[in-house]
Amino acid sequence: MSFRSFFDSIALGSIIVCTVLYALIFALSIREYLKMKRLVFILLMIECIGFIYDGIIMVSGKKMSDNILKGTNILRYILHGILVPTLIAFTGYALQFRRDKLYINWVVTLICMILGLLAAASTKMQIEKEFGKIKRCGMHDDTPGWVSSIDTMMNIGSVIYMMIAGIILFIVKREFFYFLAGFFMLIFSAIGPASGNKDLNFLLSVYGEILMIIFLFVFFKKYS
């Protein structure tokens, strides 16, 4: 089996499995919120909704016309731009910031959300080459350079912030779940671009995202 055939054989199945897992974590987060009334579980639910939408669009993309696919992917990018900064908010709750620090943390989160929204709204879409029965959109080369810069800054910056918090939590509490949430997201996000293979980058980011959400849920369930 060629490298390309291997991708084709696992890509669609991976998306479906991850989407089902997001739905499960969404349901479990509802249960935890009803028990504990913690805002962090609402944030987890919102994250899961974004990823579930992401999965549904990718799985059904091949059945859509190009115009409809581009329209649904604009919303994908908007959700991505808004939801990535919530990792900053998660970190404030993980470190148990007092009210003043938590307020500042939320202000930073909201500023980053606005920047992410502006970047997403300025993104020009193009239909990517199909693989693994997945038809998706990506960023067109005509997209302004600042959009890519903000996207990279949000993705890498928020994850590094998580990892720093994870190191602190490990030193203070001997707790490693929060660190692993950021670690897997960073590693899986870095391997793909380093390879220069867009399909590998896409597939690994899918794995990194689901591992991040799983470890976030485990952490907050344990320490809430």
Each predicted region: which residue ranges?
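C-terminal transmembrane-bundle signature of multipass membrane proteins
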Residues: 84, 158-224
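Membrane-proximal helix-loop-helix units in multi-pass membrane proteins
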Residues: 82, 91-160
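A generic, lipid-embedded transmembrane alpha helix
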Residues: 45-63
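Hydrophobic transmembrane alpha-helical segments in integral membrane proteins
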Residues: 1-25, 151-155
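Membrane-interfacial loop-to-transmembrane alpha-helix junctions, especially the N-terminal start
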Residues: 35-48, 101-108, 172-183, 224
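Internal transmembrane alpha-helix with an interfacial aromatic "cap," most often the third helix
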Residues: 23-33, 57-68, 78-113, 220
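Non-cytosolic membrane-interface motifs at loop->transmembrane helix junctions
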Residues: 67-78, 135, 198-209
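Juxtamembrane "helix-exit" motif on the non-cytosolic side of transmembrane helices
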Residues: 30, 58-67, 119-128, 189-199
